[in-house]
Amino acid sequence: MASGSMSSYGSGSWTVKQNKAFERALAVYDQDTPDRWHNVARAVGGKTPEEAKRQYDLLVRDIESIENGHVPFPDYKTTTGNSNRGRLRDEEKRMRSMKLQ
């Protein structure tokens, strides 16, 4: 999910395994869950509720950057010449118009 062009979400002391557990926990413990960040931190393991909330805030900021066009789409190269170029541009336009819920 994270890349070098994004903020520190997915980097630092968060392992890939912890990030996956974090993402799963967010799906289980929604914003209406009492003690959400305590539950998320417990599901991740080795993180405090404050660290879980900070990681969430970074994720939200990254998503907003993507939605606002601040993170460029990769320039994928095709091996068949320009035959897929139009489709890639259409996909890029579609992705730019999408808003994540």
Swiss-Prot record:
Region (Disordered): 69-101
Name the record gives this protein: Protein RADIALIS-like 2
CC terms in the record's Gene Ontology section: nucleus
Disruption phenotype: Endosperm development arrested.
Lineage of origin: Eukaryota, Viridiplantae, Streptophyta, Embryophyta, Tracheophyta
Any single biological process term in GO: gravitropism
Entry keyword Transcription: yes
Tissue expression pattern: Expressed in the funiculus of ovules and in embryos. In young ovules, expression is observed in the adaxial side of the funiculus (the stalk connecting the embryo sac to the placenta). Also expressed in heart-stage embryos, in the cortex and endodermis of the hypocotyl region but not in the cotyledons, shoot and root apical meristems, provasculature or epidermis. Not detected in young seedlings, mature roots or in young floral primordia.
Disulfide bonds: none
Compartments, record wording: Nucleus
Organism: Arabidopsis thaliana
GO MF entries: DNA-binding transcription factor activity
